[in-house]
């Protein structure tokens, strides 16, 4: 499981797994941002894991699915650019490498045209404590 803290919630009399995932971002200019996801998981009849998630800066609902060690989902956010905002879509592919590391390739698009791409690495547990905390000012 590449996600964080789990709990179970009741929805229409049915138990649904809920996951809380906290992402901490540190940008090159020193700005910090945190996104806290609340994600609900269901499983389709054919065994595909379906996910719906919300975070404060996400427009609407993020939706995705997982099969094996691969996870895909998409969501919209308003990116702050100077004094204005640009609504873009993120399409994330996340691959669980082992119990501690996941790689996320996110493509950013506007009107269906790719305008950017970012690759993130999620590290947790013992490996995270060995390499952390990360200090971008040392680069």
Language model: regions and residue ranges:
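Central antiparallel beta-sheet cores of small beta-barrel/beta-sandwich binding domains
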Residues: 1-81
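Short coil/turn motifs at beta-sheet boundaries
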Residues: 14-18, 85-87, 115
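Solvent-exposed loop/turn segments connecting transmembrane beta-strands
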Residues: 29-31, 83-85, 112-116
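Charged, gly/pro-rich active-site loop segments
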Residues: 81-86, 91
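Glycine-rich, aromatic-bearing surface loops/beta-hairpins
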Residues: 89-93, 97-139
């Amino acid at each position: 499981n590449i996600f964080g803290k789990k709990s179970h919630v009741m929805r229409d009399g049915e138990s649904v797994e809920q996951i809380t995932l906290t992402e901490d971002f540190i940008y090159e200019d020193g700005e910090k941002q945190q996104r806290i996801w609340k994600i609900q998981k269901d499983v389709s009849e054919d065994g595909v894991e379906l996910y719906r998630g919300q975070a404060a800066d996400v427009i609407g609902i993020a939706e995705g699915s997982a099969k094996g060690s691969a996870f895909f989902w998409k969501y919209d956010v308003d990116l702050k650019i100077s004094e204005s905002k640009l609504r873009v879509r993120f399409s994330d592919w996340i691959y669980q490498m082992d119990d501690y590391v996941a790689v996320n390739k996110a493509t950013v698009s506007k009107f269906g045209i790719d305008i950017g791409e970012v690759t993130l690495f999620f590290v947790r547990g013992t490996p995270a404590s060995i390499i952390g905390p990360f200090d971008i000012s040392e680069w």
